[in-house]
């Protein structure tokens, strides 16, 4: 039954996200193309057009973030706590399956939004460099890439990969926290939306406070990240690979534990405190 729920969820949201991604890629092509011709054009009107396209591209990027977050909230609240909830909760499925389907689909679409944004940046970069002779620049670019790879030891790549895992788990945990906040806000008859928003920020504050209490939030962990980004060869001197991986693993554990807690809280409230009246 979970498979059917996921199929329904992806069908219900595909048009929204698909249109948004097409708009994002179209904006990147238009903006990048305008920058490509800008160097050979001395028209004030064309410069104004480039400025407007830059604003459009920025607005679409911001809109992608906003729409992704709002869709996560709306699909959960309207589908499970609103009028559609009367139908959804009569299906032969458990509350765990309902929340799981929402969490999986939201996670997939969030990853797709990140990939779409990265692709738009790539398209923009290629179009901005289109006036260069890329074939002549390729050997130099390849040499630079090989040199950068040669400077990075195995500890760097392990740390980089683990950072990606930590970021992914934190994202899933944040989505689960959004669902838990929606359920908490649902308990308030007056101003449930405001209560849900306040609940989310309180929950995130508590999670961040506990991370800082264990000295793995904005302290050791971010120091290690900045050290890697600043100089990939200095990770051994700035912070040992073992120490970095240890702090990252604790960070991962905290994020995973909170994610499980938010998920469990959501399911429990939906099972015992749901009121669709």
Model-identified regions with their sequence ranges:
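Hydrophobic alpha-helical transmembrane segments of membrane proteins
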Residues: 1-85, 95-277
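Short helix-to-coil transition segments within interhelical loops
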Residues: 90-94
């Amino acid at each position: 039954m979970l498979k059917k729920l996921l199929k329904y969820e992806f069908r219900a949201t595909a048009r929204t996200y698909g249109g948004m991604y097409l708009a994002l890629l179209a904006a990147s092509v238009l903006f990048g193309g305008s920058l490509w011709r800008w160097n050979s054009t001395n028209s004030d009107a064309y410069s104004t057009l480039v400025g407007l396209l830059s604003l459009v591209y920025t607005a679409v990027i911001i809109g992608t973030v906003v729409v992704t977050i709002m869709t996560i909230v709306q699909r959960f609240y309207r589908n499970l706590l609103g009028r559609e909830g009367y139908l959804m909760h009569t299906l032969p499925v458990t509350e765990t399956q309902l929340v799981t389907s929402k969490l999986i689909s939201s996670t997939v679409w969030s990853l797709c939004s990140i990939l779409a944004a990265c692709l738009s940046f790539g398209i923009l970069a290629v179009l901005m460099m289109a006036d260069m002779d890329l074939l002549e620049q390729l050997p130099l670019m390849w040499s630079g890439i090989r040199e950068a790879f040669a400077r990075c030891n195995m500890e760097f790549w392990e740390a980089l990969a683990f950072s990606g895992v930590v970021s992914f788990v934190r994202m899933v945990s944040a989505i689960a926290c959004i669902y838990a906040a929606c359920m908490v806000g649902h308990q308030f008859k007056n101003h449930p939306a405001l209560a849900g928003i306040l609940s989310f920020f309180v929950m995130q504050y508590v999670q961040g406070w506990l991370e800082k209490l264990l000295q793995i939030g904005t302290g050791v962990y971010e120091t290690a990240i900045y050290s890697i980004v600043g100089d990939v060869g200095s990770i051994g001197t700035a912070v040992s690979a073992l120490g970095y991986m240890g702090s990252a693993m604790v960070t991962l554990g905290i994020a995973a534990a909170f994610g499980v807690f938010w998920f469990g809280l959501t399911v429990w409230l939906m099972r015992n405190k749901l009121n669709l009246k």
